[in-house]
Amino acid sequence: MVRPRRVFAQHWLKSEKALDAIVKAAECSTNDRILEIGPGTGILTRRLLPLVEALLAVEIDRDLCKLLVKQLGQKENFLLLQGDFLTLDLVANLLTFPKFQKPNKVVANIPYNITGPIIEKLLGTIANPNPEPFDSIVLLIQKEVAERLYAKAGSRTFGALSVRVQYLADCEFICDVPAGAFHPPPKVDSAVVRLRPRQIQIPARDPKRLENLVKLGFGAKRKMLRNNLQSVVDRDRLSQLLEQLNINPQARAEDISTQQWVELANLLGVE
């Protein structure tokens, strides 16, 4: 057995209950092509393979790649790419593997220290969304980050990440996963979430403006929004716009829903 390596933030999932929850949330069918990021020892991979048409796994650890090839390399619906998912060009690497091209779902237990960059690569950004969105993305991530993904406006966990992700996808909590479900146990609890990329109901007229507005608005979270945005709009004018949207002029960034952020950006766009 390959030992978990701290440099890659590795923790082996061992809970059958958590694995059951992940597989159920993935809603796999025999037509699905799955992308798994960081398969580790393959405990989740082995659960998924009998259920899907194809599974593409991306693993950075060479020792784990050797283990996975030895154990699963003979499976016709399994393909392993060795490399860093954040920098790997999947399209180029899959040119000669048509069966594994354009995966439609993601199912993964990802390294917690790069959760944000991974989600951004999967979803894209407000200004540059993924042009070929996945049907669903099921992730096992740090609980604190999970809470920010599906947080509602007005809650203590609602922030810039909430807005950026919720603009592009519906976010759903699946289950909690305690630290004891892993070897070695991480210092934090975890959770399974499901993201479903969707068509934007009321899109921002200028997505880049919205992106910048959200960044500025959450720059100093405890301050009122009209203070955080005074570099782009006069305070009194912002108060008028907020009232027009039925938002308290003394609201803070976390009090404003994702849709209200879009509406505010659109109003500022016609100033």
Swiss-Prot record:
Q: Which domain of life is it from?
A: Bacteria
What Enzyme Commission number(s) apply to this enzyme?
2.1.1.182
Binding-site list for S-adenosyl-L-methionine: H11, L13, G38, E59, D84, N109
> Which compartment or compartments is the protein found in?
Cytoplasm
**SUPFAM superfamilies xref list:** S-adenosyl-L-methionine-dependent methyltransferases
Question: What PROSITE patterns does the record point to?
Answer: RRNA_A_DIMETH, SAM_RNA_A_N6_MT
> Any idea what job this protein has?
Specifically dimethylates two adjacent adenosines (A1518 and A1519) in the loop of a conserved hairpin near the 3'-end of 16S rRNA in the 30S particle. May play a critical role in biogenesis of 30S subunits.
Q: Spell out the NCBIfam families in the cross-references.
A: ksgA (TIGR00755)
What is the protein name given in its UniProt record?
Ribosomal RNA small subunit methyltransferase A
